[in-house]
Amino acid sequence: YPKITIVDIKYANDALKAADDIKATLQAYPNLKGIFASNEGAAIGLAVAKKETGSKVVAIGYDSGKTQKDAIMDGTLLGSITQNPVGIGECVVNSLAKAIKGEKLEKILDTGFYWYDKSNIADPKVAAVLYD
C-alpha cells in the first residue's frame, strides 16, 4: 500500500499503557487517518484514547471481549479481526494426526479469522468465535 505511511509502532497488551501511547501518538500526528490495535488490551486502550481525546481516527481492533464489542457497537471502533479458535483446534488436531503418521506438514497453516463490525457481530458464525 504505497499511499499508507506507518508513523509509529508501539506494543502494549495493557489497556492503560495502550491508551497513554495512543493519546501521545494522536497528539504527535493530528492528521492521522487510522490506527490498528493488535490485541484485546491495545484495542480497549484505543477505544479509551479515542473517547478521551474526541479523535475521529478510524480505529480497528483485534480479538474480542465485552469492552471491545461494546466499542464496536457504539461506533468508537469500526470493527475488529478475531481468531477462529475452532479452526485453530481443527488444524492442530489434523496436523498432529499427520505428524504421528509421519506425513509432511505444510509450512504455513491458515487457521482462519473473521472481520466483525456492527453489521455482522450477531451473525451466528461470528458470534460463536467471540468471547466476553
Question: What is each PLM-predicted segment?
Answer:
Residues Y1-D132:
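A residue-level marker of the well-folded mature domains of exported/periplasmic proteins
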